[in-house]
């Protein structure tokens, strides 16, 4: 009986470790994929009808399912084409609670998640989108972290649970309620499946000063 319980515990632990590793791998894959798409867009421009509209003096153009707008990099004259999964017209019902702009001047920001949670694919997609924009537009270094050191994938990662002062972080949470809010030294970005990605894009558009 004890052996059976031990085997079940080992299987459960192995499953959790695989999920956490999957999260890290998906972040890397999606980041590379997005950068490749951006590069191909300029190397092989396509002549096609595109959906486009203006919002708050920013033009949003839908190309192959992604929304692009041009953003000037903070403190420079460089302009980047930023890809998002959702445009402002789809994000008006998500409010920002608290002062998220206080995080824009940080040198590093941790991107943390619960390794024992679920739906890592949406968390990874959100993490990669936020990470690319932090580095490319705000010159902020994103650091992958975990809220607990409970899986093999998190052994070499910093533990950031939003309870320790001096660790600015974005905590990606898979929850039913779609929210973006500040608590302690963290920005909590939460939602269910694609709603989590929406919440991530909403934060970015706030930081770009496109949406209030």
Model-predicted regions and their roles:
Residues 1-20:
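N-terminal Lys/Arg-rich, disordered targeting/topogenic segments
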Residues 11, 31, 41-43, 48, ...:
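Short, flexible coil/linker segments at or flanking structured domains
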Residues 13-18, 54-55, 62:
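Glycan-processing catalytic domains of CAZymes
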Residues 16, 20, 30-32, 57:
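Residue-level signal for well-ordered alpha-helical segments
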Residues 24-42:
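Hydrophobic membrane-insertion alpha-helices, especially the h-region
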Residues 43-59:
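Ser/Thr/Pro/Gly-rich low-complexity linker/stalk segments immediately outside membranes or between
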Residues 62-212:
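Long, folded non-catalytic interaction modules
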């Amino acid at each position: 009986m004890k052996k059976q319980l031990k085997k079940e515990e080992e299987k459960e632990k192995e499953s959790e470790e695989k999920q956490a590793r999957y999260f890290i791998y998906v972040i890397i894959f999606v980041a590379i994929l997005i950068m490749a798409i951006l590069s191909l867009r300029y190397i092989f421009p396509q002549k096609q009808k595109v959906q486009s509209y203006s919002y708050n003096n920013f033009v949003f153009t839908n190309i192959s399912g992604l929304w692009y707008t041009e953003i000037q990099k903070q403190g420079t004259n460089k302009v980047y084409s930023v890809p998002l999964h959702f445009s402002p017209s789809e994000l008006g019902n998500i409010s920002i609670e608290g002062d998220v702009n206080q995080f824009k001047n940080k040198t590093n920001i941790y991107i943390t998640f619960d390794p024992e949670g679920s739906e890592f694919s949406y968390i990874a997609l959100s993490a990669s989108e936020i990470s690319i924009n932090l580095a490319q537009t705000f010159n902020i270094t994103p650091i992958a972290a975990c809220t607990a050191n409970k899986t093999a994938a998190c052994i070499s990662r910093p533990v950031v649970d939003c309870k320790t002062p001096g660790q600015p972080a974005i905590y990606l949470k898979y929850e039913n309620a779609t929210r973006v809010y500040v608590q302690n030294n963290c920005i909590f970005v939460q939602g269910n499946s694609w709603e989590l990605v929406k919440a991530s894009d909403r934060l970015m558009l706030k930081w770009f000063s496109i949406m209030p």
